[in-house]
Amino acid sequence: MSMTELSGVRTFLLGLQERVTAAVAEVDGGDFITDAWQKEPGEPLQGNGITKILENGEVFERAGCGFSHVQGSRLPPSATQHRPELAGAPFEAMGVSLVFHPRNPYVPTVHMNVRMLAATPVSAGPAEAVCWFGGGMDLTPYYGFDEDAVHFHQTCKDALAPFGGDKYPRFKQWCDEYFYLKHRQEQRGIGGIFFDDFQELGLEQSFAMMQSVADSFLPAYLPIVRRRQSQPYGARERDFQLYRRGRYVEFNLVWDRGTHFGLQSGGRTESILMSMPPLASWSYQHRAEAGSPEERLYKEFLIRRDWV
């Protein structure tokens, strides 16, 4: 990948961060704090980034959106599970990652990430760098609504349609398999799309597909926020929201490759953990009441299901 191509990816990602945070700030009425950072000389990773975070807003308790562009001397194990030939290779990675935790339990939590990684096998020269893209988005409701799930998945499907009819079903299944808490035997949410190590369309079209996914995020999520943000709720709904947020914490710390990659490679911990909810709770052997909306979430939404 040339310097010009790398610059194009960086420019797109920075613009994406600006567009998303501006739109979310307009919905919430609050302001994002901008924290630009630079890695110090001598650290395992070199590079820079911008973390934007909104906390204690009207709509969002925490909304974090981070851009990072880093270089390292050795790919960490979390990035070479499917590419053993790249173990220990120097690499360059950049991406935008966001997680929004709403205040109202009827508004779902959302995660989106798009990224590019280039690595040079130890035995190769710079011209032989291997480059791939990854990304996706997924929705984690606390109370399920069919119309929200259908809208989210349809928007994801439409974003991938120009790149082949096989992409949505493949990436939807990948998402279902990835965002699964093995120790709980539960889906994290209703899924969405997920792809990684992707280069099969060639550099230009693979980047275009990543851009299409990124550009579909606001149309996929904000209509759901607007539909649910003023819905009345009480202590019961809030308690269940906090309990389910505990599952989010468990997944991110135990299973998420992105979190592991950041921590294993010497990334910026404060930015990596901005995905954590501001409040969460755990209750021993919690059981949803039979026939309740909470039970419906488990039976009808936290399952692998074709929404479109």
Curated annotation (Swiss-Prot):
<dbReference type="GO" id="GO:0046872">
    <property type="term" value="F:metal ion binding"/>
</dbReference>
<feature type="binding site">
    <location>
        <position position="153"/>
    </location>
    <ligand>
        <name>a divalent metal cation</name>
    </ligand>
</feature>
<keyword id="KW-0963">Cytoplasm</keyword>
<feature type="active site" description="Proton donor">
    <location>
        <position position="111"/>
    </location>
</feature>
<comment type="pathway">
    <text>Porphyrin-containing compound metabolism; protoporphyrin-IX biosynthesis; protoporphyrinogen-IX from coproporphyrinogen-III (O2 route): step 1/1.</text>
</comment>
<keyword id="KW-0560">Oxidoreductase</keyword>
<feature type="site" description="Important for dimerization">
    <location>
        <position position="183"/>
    </location>
</feature>
<feature type="binding site">
    <location>
        <position position="183"/>
    </location>
    <ligand>
        <name>a divalent metal cation</name>
    </ligand>
</feature>
<protein>
    <recommendedName>
        <fullName>Oxygen-dependent coproporphyrinogen-III oxidase</fullName>
        <ecNumber>1.3.3.3</ecNumber>
    </recommendedName>
</protein>
<keyword id="KW-0627">Porphyrin biosynthesis</keyword>
<keyword id="KW-0350">Heme biosynthesis</keyword>
<dbReference type="GO" id="GO:0004109">
    <property type="term" value="F:coproporphyrinogen oxidase activity"/>
</dbReference>
<comment type="subunit">
    <text>Homodimer.</text>
</comment>
<comment type="function">
    <text>Involved in the heme biosynthesis. Catalyzes the aerobic oxidative decarboxylation of propionate groups of rings A and B of coproporphyrinogen-III to yield the vinyl groups in protoporphyrinogen-IX.</text>
</comment>
<feature type="binding site">
    <location>
        <position position="97"/>
    </location>
    <ligand>
        <name>substrate</name>
    </ligand>
</feature>
<feature type="binding site">
    <location>
        <position position="101"/>
    </location>
    <ligand>
        <name>a divalent metal cation</name>
    </ligand>
</feature>
<feature type="binding site">
    <location>
        <position position="111"/>
    </location>
    <ligand>
        <name>a divalent metal cation</name>
    </ligand>
</feature>
<dbReference type="Pfam" id="PF01218">
    <property type="entry name" value="Coprogen_oxidas"/>
</dbReference>
<feature type="region of interest" description="Important for dimerization">
    <location>
        <begin position="248"/>
        <end position="283"/>
    </location>
</feature>
<feature type="binding site">
    <location>
        <begin position="266"/>
        <end position="268"/>
    </location>
    <ligand>
        <name>substrate</name>
    </ligand>
</feature>
<dbReference type="InterPro" id="IPR036406">
    <property type="entry name" value="Coprogen_oxidase_aer_sf"/>
</dbReference>
<comment type="similarity">
    <text>Belongs to the aerobic coproporphyrinogen-III oxidase family.</text>
</comment>
<keyword id="KW-0479">Metal-binding</keyword>
<feature type="binding site">
    <location>
        <begin position="113"/>
        <end position="115"/>
    </location>
    <ligand>
        <name>substrate</name>
    </ligand>
</feature>
<dbReference type="InterPro" id="IPR018375">
    <property type="entry name" value="Coprogen_oxidase_CS"/>
</dbReference>
<dbReference type="GO" id="GO:0006782">
    <property type="term" value="P:protoporphyrinogen IX biosynthetic process"/>
</dbReference>
<dbReference type="GO" id="GO:0042803">
    <property type="term" value="F:protein homodimerization activity"/>
</dbReference>
<dbReference type="InterPro" id="IPR001260">
    <property type="entry name" value="Coprogen_oxidase_aer"/>
</dbReference>
<dbReference type="GO" id="GO:0005737">
    <property type="term" value="C:cytoplasm"/>
</dbReference>
